[in-house]
Regions:
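Residue-level detector of the short coil/turn that links helix A to helix B
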Residues: 17, 37, 57-60, 108, ...
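Non-membrane alpha-helical segments in proteins
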Residues: 4-15, 28, 40-58, 91-106, ...
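Structural register within alpha-helical repeat arrays
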Residues: 9, 42, 49, 93, ...
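Single-residue signature of alpha-solenoid repeat helices
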Residues: 22, 62-65, 113, 158, ...
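Amphipathic alpha-helical segments of tetratricopeptide repeats
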Residues: 27-34, 67-82, 118-130, 163-175, ...
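Alpha-helical solenoid repeat scaffolds used for protein-protein interaction
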Residues: 261, 269-275, 279-281, 287-564
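Residue at a conserved register position within TPR or TPR-like alpha-solenoid repeats
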Residues: 13, 33, 46, 53, ...
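Residue register of alpha-helical TPR repeats
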Residues: 4, 42-46, 88-91, 95, ...
């Protein structure tokens, strides 16, 4: 047996996504290596096994690999130094540090991952033969740490890591399968980050290059993962057909390789495309599969999103108690997660307000409201035939019941909308501010306006209009694609340009500089008063936003008079 050749074969199998085959081959080599008493080859086996276990989420296997590598390296480090021992200690110390960084990231210990990554960053005098491997390990470790941050919705904290990844890739000159694999992993990871944060134009070339490089090497799993991220981008761009095509191509490969998290994401997007064509029952079946897979993995943030997404089926079916129960389960998951943020709670409250709004519209005779006693197929037909009009009569018991429910919807949606929008003008970059408005605050504010209008609350409508007029946010520019609120419940872009901690917006949030010529003010506005003898507008809802989410919707300054 030519052990070095077999080690190369094992690495090729791992790159191709056949971790089981690679693991079995590596384990079969151990008796031969022990007979030859080659510690350097045994260390390579342990390092490769650790990477396989890391990729498959077998954390105990990663820990054992790290322990055995460190034990062997410690023995050589205590011997008199020579070229062989120096090379061995330097190389496999780094391989162990890489595994430590990846393991800490995988279990959500982001501080530990940062510490391990800093150790791997050691740029002291390097051995020429190890320089390119060291660069590759740094790139790969940063990608793993950044992906783990994004999985915990900590996209803002991942930005410095992604910036270093992009910079290092520009300087990375190595060739061969190892180098190609590093570029593919980084391309898919960074492309997904760009999709998650709404930078679709930047994501596309990264994902296409990663897919092309994976295809050239025959790595079908990497190709499928790139296709899945491209599908997510297509959905964000409102291209339902493109999403369906890419997910359908990616899913069989991802399922064959048993990548549970990506399988769940495939089912999520398949369900979205089904709902986009009005197939409620098919969408619910897809999301049921996604929920099951995320429960198996124990991913609370993903699970909370799929529960919110599944609640739309109950909303369309007019089974509002079921929808409220799903949202309550999602709230419990946020409560149990150390990574939850005020923004997630605000969006959840806004969605709960949507349930109250839908319940109210059913009382008001909305022609597309479902019947909880009918089948989903009958609800699908009702949705297809509906004209979006109300048949109820003013003054009836049903009418007043609906008005009460709309009031409750406003109690949820308006404070959430004000809290979310309070972030927008703390963002100094105009493009980033526009992304936040289009993908985060805009849809939530639209829901608040809709409830105020349907509630026939002219005072609230006028105050919301005044709030927007003071911000100068009405325009006649290009409109975002027309799509239902359901389309982004589980796939909304995640902002990275602002801090989501429950504190007032800090970026340029003080008083305006005197004498400035700009008509646009960053940070919260002072309270707005529409009439001399009235309280500042939206006072009740601003107080709720502060109580629930810790957001200061207005600045601590004298009120502006808007009637002058």
């Amino acid at each position: 047996v030519l052990i070095p050749d077999e080690l190369d074969n094992a690495r090729r199998l791992a790159f191709a996504g056949d971790e089981a085959g690679a693991r079995d081959l590596l384990l079969s080599l151990i008796p031969h290596i022990e007979r030859e008493d080659r510690d350097d080859l045994m260390l390579e086996v342990l390092a490769q096994l650790g990477e396989i276990y890391l990729d498959r989420g077998v954390n105990d296997g990663v820990r054992e690999s790290i322990r055995r590598i460190q034990d062997c390296v410690a023995i050589y480090a205590g011997m008199p130094a020579d070229a062989h021992s120096t090379h061995l200690v330097r190389r496999y110390s780094r391989r162990a540090q890489f595994l430590q960084a990846g393991l800490a990231a995988a279990i959500g210990d982001h501080d530990g991952a940062a510490t391990a990554l800093a150790a791997l960053e050691d740029r002291g005098a390097d051995l020429p033969r190890l320089a390119q491997e060291h660069a590759r390990l740094r790139i790969h470790a940063r990608v793993l740490c950044a992906i783990a941050l994004c999985d915990d919705d900590l996209h803002t904290q991942s930005v410095p890591l992604w910036e270093k990844v992009v910079s290092d890739l520009n300087d990375y000159r190595d060739t061969g399968e190892d180098a190609d694999h590093a570029r593919v992993v980084a391309g898919i990871g960074y492309g997904k980050f760009c999709v998650d944060t709404g930078r679709l134009a930047e994501a596309d070339p990264w994902l296409r290059r990663a897919e092309a490089r994976a295809r050239a090497n025959g790595w079908e799993l990497a190709m499928a993962r790139a296709q899945l991220e491209r599908a997510a981008a297509r959905w964000a761009a409102n291209d339902h057909a493109g999403t369906e095509q890419l997910v359908s191509e990616a899913y069989p490969v991802i399922a064959r390789h048993a990548r549970t998290h990506d399988i769940a994401r495939c089912w999520l997007y398949l369900g979205l495309t089904r709902l986009g064509s009005g197939a409620l029952e098919a969408a619910d079946e897809c999301w049921e599969h996604a929920e099951r897979h995320w429960r198996e993995l124990g991913k609370p943030l993903y699970l909370h999103r799929i529960l919110l997404q599944r609640s739309w089926i109950a909303i369309f079916w007019s089974r509002f108690a079921d929808a409220v129960e799903l949202i309550a389960q999602a709230r419990e998951l946020l409560d149990s997660s150390p990574r939850s943020s005020w923004l997630q709670y605000a969006l959840l409250d806004s969605h709960l307000g949507t349930v109250w709004r839908a319940d109210a519209l059913a009382d008001l005779g909305f022609d597309s409201s479902g019947d909880p006693d009918e089948t989903l197929q009958e609800t699908e037909a009702r949705q297809a035939e509906g004209l979006g009009i109300l048949h109820g009569e003013i003054g009836t018991d049903e009418y007043w019941r609906g008005m009460t429910k709309l009031q409750q919807a406003a109690e949820l949606k308006v404070p959430a909308a004000l809290a979310v929008d309070s972030v927008r003008y703390s963002i100094a970059d105009a493009d980033a501010r526009a992304r936040w408005a289009a993908t985060v605050s805009g849809p939530v504010l639209a829901g608040a306006f809709a409830v105020a209008w349907e509630w026939e609350n002219t005072e609230l409508i006028s105050e919301l209009v005044e709030y927007h007029s003071a911000r100068g946010t009405f325009d006649t520019g290009p409109q975002r694609p027309q799509t239902g609120e359901w389309a982004s419940t589980a796939t909304a872009p995640v902002p990275v340009e602002t801090d989501l901690e429950p504190v007032p917006a800090l970026a340029a949030s003080g008083p305006s500089a005197p004498g400035g010529a700009s008509l646009t003010r960053l940070g919260p506005l002072p309270p707005l008063r529409m009439q001399p003898d009235a309280e500042p507008i939206l006072s009740h809802y601003r107080e709720l936003a502060a109580q629930r989410y810790g957001r200061d919707v207005t600045a601590a300054e004298p009120a502006w008079s808007t009637w002058r």
